[in-house]
Amino acid sequence: MNQPLQHITVLLDEAVDALLDGAAQPVAGQWVDATFGRGGHSRRILQRLGPDGALLAFDKDPDAIEEAARITDARFSIRHEGFRHLSELPAGSVQGVLMDLGVSSPQIDNPERGFSFRFEGPLDMRMDTTRGQSVADWLAEADAQQIAEVIRDYGEERFAGPIAKAIVARRESQGPLRNTAELAELVAGAVRTREAGQNPATRTFQALRIFINAELEELEQALEASLRVLAPGGRLVVISFHSLEDRIVKQFIAKHSKEVYDRRAPFAVPTPMRLEALGRIKPSEAEVAANARSRSAVMRVARRTGVPA
């Protein structure tokens, strides 16, 4: 079995510089790392904060909470919750929010988590292993139409129908799927054509992970919450790793970075923009060469205006 890979934080300096607006001096105020992971961004942010700065992190993963316990800095705190709970912070109280979406290398490379088709392990895929339904449990009760919709909508898999039928047929003949190897083998048999350089199970595993963790719904909730909690001039920095995430982030920033006119009342004052889009950044060639998993990353940055949410 391959050894688990060490997590390499993607766009580390670029993200923190964007969050802190390139500040050369230690900064004050309340900051949020909405997806602690293994703490790469949090540790770098803490290095840039002054004595009056504070960093609040969020993460669902018990392993992330365990890693966060190693940070003894009094300016740091973490909540064992998803980042949709940003909504519980006071309005206008935060100077910057950073979101690094997706799964970390330690999660992917730990067979016991069930995120990867490369390792045999339980078919779990929950970000928070202390609560919720596993992929195995859901596949044991969902019908073919439900399974196909999830794989199609969240994996953009054109063979979603045949895959779903194969899962249900396997369940009816041999019992429910229980490990990643069984699912990967079944998907490989149902996918009629292969994409060069991509395992046929890639899209199905992505879809089931996104669905079981309600990742896109939580992202939408967290983005809306960030609009309310960010102070005027505060930064929103989001790193995404696939088109479904990036599309949501891109559309959210675009929606709030333009004046909105009510066509039913053409002479009414338009709703002013609440965000100023500051662009997107991709990893450098050097970063991709050092960390192949950074290849698909896209970072989008926006600044909060003074218009109320």
UniProtKB/Swiss-Prot annotation:
GO biological process terms on file: rRNA base methylation
Gene3D superfamilies noted in UniProt: Putative methyltransferase TM0872, insert domain (1.10.150.170), Vaccinia Virus protein VP39 (3.40.50.150)
Binding site for S-adenosyl-L-methionine: G39, G40, H41, D59, F83, D100, Q107
GO molecular function: rRNA (cytosine-N4-)-methyltransferase activity
Keyword line: Cytoplasm, Methyltransferase, rRNA processing, S-adenosyl-L-methionine, Transferase
Catalyzed reaction equations: cytidine(1402) in 16S rRNA + S-adenosyl-L-methionine = N(4)-methylcytidine(1402) in 16S rRNA + S-adenosyl-L-homocysteine + H(+)
Localization terms from the record: Cytoplasm
Chief localization: cytoplasm
Similarity comment: family membership: Belongs to the methyltransferase superfamily. RsmH family.
Name of the protein described by the UniProt record: Ribosomal RNA small subunit methyltransferase H
Source organism of the structure: Delftia acidovorans (strain DSM 14801 / SPH-1)
Gene name per UniProt: rsmH
